[in-house]
Amino acid sequence: MTPQLSSSVASKLVTLKLKPVVVFGPSGVGKSTLLKRLLKDHGDKLGFSVSHTTRTPRAGEKDGIDYHFVTKEEFQKLVAEEKFVEWAVFSGNMYGTSIMAIQELEAVNKKAILDIDLQGVLQVKASPIDAQYVFLAPPSIEQLEVRLRGRGTENESAILQRLERARAEIEYSEKPGNFDALIVNDDVEKAYKQLEAICLSD
């Protein structure tokens, strides 16, 4: 079951002056690489909405930069206090975007960039929040599998679960009206230029 965004939470974000950009797509498609470059090049105008998660940090990940790493109890407390715009559970781990993360960016005149999964996208779409939705797609499901296996960060079961989830996300992206822009990441430079143009547009 997909958690629902409460009206009290949504009302706090309806008045955003800068339209957030929601970037979604299968795990391993290259979102992190493109977004890190985007924020490095345009950190004065754009800001990454750092999500909360209960999962264990991967090698090289830093708390407060890649994610806010919290315990399950801490995460559940934030859910109960309606601190999240959206939240979801995947592979036993919880992920969420806090209201404060977006508000802090708005306060310094930066457009919020959200990297969330399909569950989160559906929650934000069901709210009054006016956002722009960008789907980042792999050249093929086969190439996505190669990328996932090449990372070497997960076991076979986790990889198969991510591939199953990727198929559902791609199926969702193929339906008219479910996104504002589709970018196929078959050429990193080309994909970056497309994403850059979208995020910098008014």
Swiss-Prot record:
PROSITE patterns the UniProt entry points to: GUANYLATE_KINASE_1, GUANYLATE_KINASE_2
Residue positions binding ATP: 25-32
Source species, domain of life: Eukaryota
Keywords recorded for this protein, A-Z: ATP-binding, Kinase, Nucleotide-binding, Transferase
Domain Guanylate kinase-like: 18-200
Reactions listed under catalytic activity: GMP + ATP = GDP + ADP
Gene Ontology MF terms in the entry: ATP binding; guanylate kinase activity
GO biological process, one term: purine nucleotide metabolic process
EC number per UniProt: 2.7.4.8
Pfam families in alphabetical order: Guanylate_kin (PF00625)
One Gene Ontology cellular component: nucleus
Record carries keyword Nucleotide-binding: yes
Cross-referenced CDD domains: GMPK
SMART domains reported for this sequence: GuKc
Function, as annotated: Essential for recycling GMP and indirectly, cGMP.
Entry-linked NCBIfam families: guanyl_kin (TIGR03263)
Family: Belongs to the guanylate kinase family.
Protein name: Guanylate kinase
Species lineage: Eukaryota, Fungi, Dikarya, Ascomycota, Taphrinomycotina
